[in-house]
Amino acid sequence: MTGRRRFGVLPGDPAGIGYEIAVKALREYDEAGALPAAFVVYAHAGLFELARARYAPKMQIARARTPGEIDGTGIYYIDVGYGDDDIAPGVVSAQAARCAHRAIERCTLDVTNGDIDGICTGPIHKGAMRLANIGEIGHTEMLAHAFDAPNPITLFLTNDLRIFFYTRHWSLRQAIDALDVEQLVAFGETINVHMRQLGFASPHLALAALNPHASDGGQFGDEEERILVPAANRLRRLGIDISDPIGADSVFYLASRGKYDAVVSLYHDQGHIAAKTYDFDRTISATLGLPVLRTSVDHGTAMDIAWRGMAQHVSMK
């Protein structure tokens, strides 16, 4: 391993927009002429070369067998495809899912071997993963399993707005049932540590409420009184600066204006709607609690526009 860093790029499902946005994002770095690291793309070689020919024909890339043989900066790719992969643009299929899954498996192995220093992921299709009978259907779950990391944390970054997710891909009913004082306290302690690692000496956290108007004293539910307020009180006694529950219709606005350093979102859509409404294209997702930092786009495979040159690549960049 040299002093140079190597970042693994996982374009995601090859039937979707992942290959297009990965190539477009890498093209910008290549055109700037100052690559900050070696970017190692784990992809179906034929489809990656096709994407390069369509969207970045002048971009210089090289094929590598392993990231360990790469010295210096540049754009490289490692072939994870099979020659007989029957992958059609815009079509959800088990073949495409298996190709994306092989890329994840190979990249995580290289991380474990110390050859990759960070991961950037494009979108995969959860329905395709089910068709392929792959156990974990999301990147976060797959990476957590591969690295034996039991408690990965999802952080959304949208300009100056930061959102931590207490739950992710659960139904709303499951997310509500998962509200628990002890678990919220543990979650608050963990994200406080992560915020300090990100450079916030005394992070000021906001807790999003579950019910309208934070239940208005119990008029619209009792989760705030039973669970959220006791958890916030416990965290403050531990020296963590966190608010009482604040209505979700205002807490994200307040954080975007700098009143809070980060917001605790209780369920998937609560934070996703806020971030994507604020700036859909520039929202990125980071997964903390893994051996390396993983960043990701905040959108899906967009099969309806796949391989048509229409996809925005800002989030991937």
Locate the predicted segments by residue.
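Short, flexible loop segments at boundaries between secondary-structure elements
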Residues: H145-L161, L288-D304
